[in-house]
């Protein structure tokens, strides 16, 4: 990443900025036409077609498609990431909440340190369309082939987050020297992503942080320190009142999407070229995910730094031991590449409950690794609870499982030769029925779409007719049918 180039770009933008509105007393303004006051967080160039956003968005604001917006530094929506000390603070944050609306087709760029944080009690209404998706990308250049060129998007909500082994910000003392989740507690969980990210979490499972629909997030991934990163899309305690549907995360330096607790359900996601995990959930996430395409970068042979490029990672072990974690996933297609040498399509780790339906894993050296939880206490090891229903894989040299098999296998589970079409659908038209779907009961009433096929796209679908067609980044799924497998260098 060329930092000098990026800082220069911001400097050039800043040098040409003037207020979008004016309160000048010159003769040119001597009429009765009202002049809008420029928000304190916004400065625009003379033409008004590029605006830099800084600091805190402290009032309702709409980003329009005729303007390019630049996120300079940590940009907060509202002030809900400060520490709450009483229930009245939560109520006030909700009452005073602001909404950032982004119009379809809007171009939002991030400077090197640009991060958008939607804080507790506030909303992001980013509703693009298939023909006019909303795009977050780097200010550095006009293409989408960078990696880690800006921060990313963080949403912080008031839904529950669970700490290690029955501890944490939302827990209280229970009977017999135990701790219990306190539904009345005021929770302040420190978020990942560096200084200024602040706090998230609460006791409102149905919390609503807005809508992300037909949104693309590209070239992000700020590293703040060891195990402390901004993902493409980071979901911290986000409630199931939030809608996330038709979202792409492309070329992120860290994870594509990571859930820290919360209850938000996610559907129709495309995760391409991300350097670490693509779907990562932990700290008591309770939610459902359906229809996801994961495609690792076909042009890379090694990941950056210590990244482990897996398709799905669910964590609840050692310092991340959180047995409340529960995820149900359906119709996922995981496609590895040379960069996934020595990696697993899924790593389901620790004391968690996971159910995976109608899913295909191809081009990893092992399809599924299941690890039980080392708690770090006298309790010793707690088994994972993993159910696989119609989960097939084409992985080598270790084949389908590493460590141990799932606790429950239903339907067809195991090694099956897999070929894909340009639509990211399986070529085989085998019918895979699910007799009993069991979504996570997080209070949302979520129900899986009753599919009878494996993978994210129905076999026989033409690429032009796939649910991802027309809105994802051009070329990001090209060649998926012919993607090379990794070299056989597997080692635990």
Regions found by a protein language model. Name each.
Residues 132-135:
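Glycine-rich loop(s) and the adjacent beta-strand/alpha-helix scaffold that form part
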Residues 3, 10-47:
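Bacterial Sec-dependent N-terminal signal peptides
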Residues 30, 34-97, 113-121, 128, ...:
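Extracellular beta-rich repeat passengers
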